Regions:
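Structural motif
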Residues: 42-45, 70-71, 133-135
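"Rare, low-scoring activations can occur
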Residues: 49, 55-67, 134-143, 150-215
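Membrane-interface junction motifs in transport/secretion proteins
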Residues: 27-51
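Alpha-helical transmembrane segments
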Residues: 7-35
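Hydrophobic secondary-structure segments that place a key small or acidic residue at a functional site
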Residues: 94-171
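Short amphipathic beta-strand/extended segments in non-transmembrane regions
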Residues: 55-118
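Short, hydrophobic beta-strand segments
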Residues: 38-41, 83-89, 187-189
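N-terminal Sec/SRP start-transfer signal
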Residues: 1-6
């Protein structure tokens, strides 16, 4: 068999593999709704001094439903989520913590299947309670109302991908950033389904420029 023929076969197989991967990624469910959400990384100036102006300016556009925040971007990097440990059932256990605003799950359409979601009243607590994922519920034998790491488990979310598809799901909790110094530097802007996305994104850019011309 000629060398060119072998190379052609390899290229055809590679192309088929890439198409299958693309098809899989298009159909693969992350467990949250990213289609109507625009993610914007902010600088500290906006978050520290102009957060209310930022949210208020965005909501002047009728197609924008809500704005949520987090310390890191969900599902962007496997190693960007805080890893913590706790003493539980007489052993050390490790889990990942994702710090976000109280409306984050609703903006991202991550369902809470047991218990409840965060509310604004939870912001008044000295330290944040948790909403856990199914892996934490399974591995740590936890349920809504249980105590874990000196916090109360408020609810259990629907399963979703917080890291890449190549890594198995592991214990993960959502927490409000009441008790950490890190600012929330990522914003998630949810549009309704009838929004003109091009116009809405232009409004986001204009809002940012009005607050910080250097952005």
């Amino acid at each position: 068999i000629g060398f060119q023929f072998i190379v052609s076969i390899v290229l055809i197989i590679s192309a088929m593999f890439v198409r299958q991967q693309n098809r899989f990624m298009q159909k693969y469910s992350l467990g949250f709704d990213k289609d109507q959400v625009v993610v914007v990384e902010l600088n500290r100036n906006i978050m520290h001094d102009h957060k209310d102006s930022y949210v208020g300016g965005l909501k002047e556009y009728p197609g924008i439903e809500d704005v949520a925040f987090s310390v890191y971007e969900l599902s962007k990097e496997d190693d960007m989520i805080d890893l913590e440990y706790a003493r539980h059932e007489d052993k050390d256990v490790f889990f990942k913590v994702f710090y976000a605003s109280e409306n984050f799950l609703s903006v991202m359409d991550i369902q809470v299947e047991e218990g409840r979601d965060f509310t604004r009243e939870d912001l008044n607590k000295a330290q944040s309670d948790y909403i856990i994922n199914p892996a934490a519920e399974r591995d740590f034998h936890l349920h809504p109302g249980d105590r874990f790491n000196d916090r109360t488990v408020l609810g259990v979310s629907k399963d979703f991908r917080f890291n890449s598809c190549r890594i198995a799901s592991s214990p993960f909790v959502f927490a409000l950033n009441n008790d950490i110094p890190n600012p929330k530097l990522v914003s998630y802007i949810r549009f309704n389904s009838k929004t003109n996305l091009q116009e809405a994104v232009a409004h986001v850019r204009e809002t940012l420029k009005e607050i910080d011309p250097t952005f």
